[in-house]
């Protein structure tokens, strides 16, 4: 009988070490003096700088990127999907006013491809730089029998900090407040299962096909990274009181905005922005009902802020100074803790 090794059973420890070597330089770009120990150890060490805080509150979030992975897999392009992963986590941290501190990742694969994982982590590092947080560690798990060769999944975990008295939870939102929408970069990381079904099956589109309306291939459009809103919003928080914020993810504006509304108020949205072409294409190709579009996709608005009317112009001016398009898209009125969309 031949000797049996871990590698023969489907787990290549040497490939895992190769991944660490490949990603080290990218990860180190994200580190700051607060990181006492990053990748390579059993755990990461982060020294919380409480200067400027009276009662610092740690905020945590975890997320993934759903079936956007299938687009990356089909195209063999993995260098931007890590940006999406960071965006999904740090944008959620941001909704309560938290500054992201550090990020960790989990990558699970059927068969480890060091180059593929290195590309994934490269994107994560890029996202962390954009969010001004440190990529302090992660886990790469090779699991033959759980995943088929070529299949993989990723998850991200983030921690941020906010002053307790400055937590933004929507509790002060009242009738008369104004809703500001900040543009998305496209489909972001939600609704890809519906998009794939509508475009690739119903519409018979191909990911490599050039689409005139986009000026790029369909696959490139779908892989456009999720926008990270951290820097402009943290800057805005120093100038304007923000009463509530929502990251528009799965469920769209319809399901996400009510999460920050107090009882007895509702959000009335007027669609005065140009809905991105990708959503129009999905709707047409799949004959997707309009109500389903609004409950699945961001429809061009990736992040929402609620401010009092007197602060609207300053808020929009600040956001646009970072080259983030922003509009007044609605108002808060007395009502039933819901969203009403007027097209």
UniProtKB/Swiss-Prot annotation:
Annotated keywords: ATP-binding, Cytoplasm, Ligase, Nucleotide-binding, Purine biosynthesis
Record localization: Cytoplasm
Pfam families: AIRS, AIRS_C
Tagged with keyword ATP-binding: yes
Cellular compartments per GO CC: cytosol
The keyword Ligase is assigned to this record: yes
EC class (word): ligase
GO molecular function: ATP binding; phosphoribosylamine-glycine ligase activity; phosphoribosylformylglycinamidine cyclo-ligase activity
Catalyses which reaction(s): 2-formamido-N(1)-(5-O-phospho-beta-D-ribosyl)acetamidine + ATP = 5-amino-1-(5-phospho-beta-D-ribosyl)imidazole + ADP + phosphate + H(+)
Annotated GO biological process: 'de novo' IMP biosynthetic process; adenine biosynthetic process
UniProt main location, coarse: cytoplasm
InterPro entries reported for this sequence: PurM-like_C_dom, PurM-like_C_sf, PurM-like_N, PurM-like_N_sf, PurM_cligase
UniProt name for this protein: Phosphoribosylformylglycinamidine cyclo-ligase
Native source organism of the sequence: Carboxydothermus hydrogenoformans (strain ATCC BAA-161 / DSM 6008 / Z-2901)
The encoding gene: purM
